[in-house]
Amino acid sequence: MEQINLNMITAFTIALMGVLTYRSHLMSTLLCLEGMMLSLFILMVLLISHSHMVSMSMAPLILLVFSACEAGVGLALLVTISHTYGNDYVQNLNLLQC
């Protein structure tokens, strides 16, 4: 395994551990999710360029589009939660509450 692939897998794992560790605040969770998406993007670009799969060359761009949409929805949710409750705790996101 090449060194850069190992580094990207390590970055993904660290970001995943950050999501699991810092899940009390929404902003920390969003930052860790963005780190995961960035490492997935770099891994996908490296895999496609290494194996010369021309048919999959649009996949990293599609991943970036979904990542931007996820960030936009997450930030809109963060603004709404912080405006309504005054903080960004994930425990305020109880959607089953009547």
Swiss-Prot record:
Its main location: mitochondrion. GO terms for cellular component: mitochondrial inner membrane; respiratory chain complex I. It is found in: Mitochondrion inner membrane. One of its GO terms (biological process) is ATP synthesis coupled electron transport. Its EC number is 7.1.1.2. It is a multi-pass membrane protein. The keyword Electron transport applies. One of its GO terms (molecular function) is NADH dehydrogenase (ubiquinone) activity. Keywords: Electron transport, Membrane, Mitochondrion, Mitochondrion inner membrane, NAD, Respiratory chain, Translocase, Transmembrane, Transmembrane helix, Transport, Ubiquinone. Belongs to the complex I subunit 4L family. This is NADH-ubiquinone oxidoreductase chain 4L.
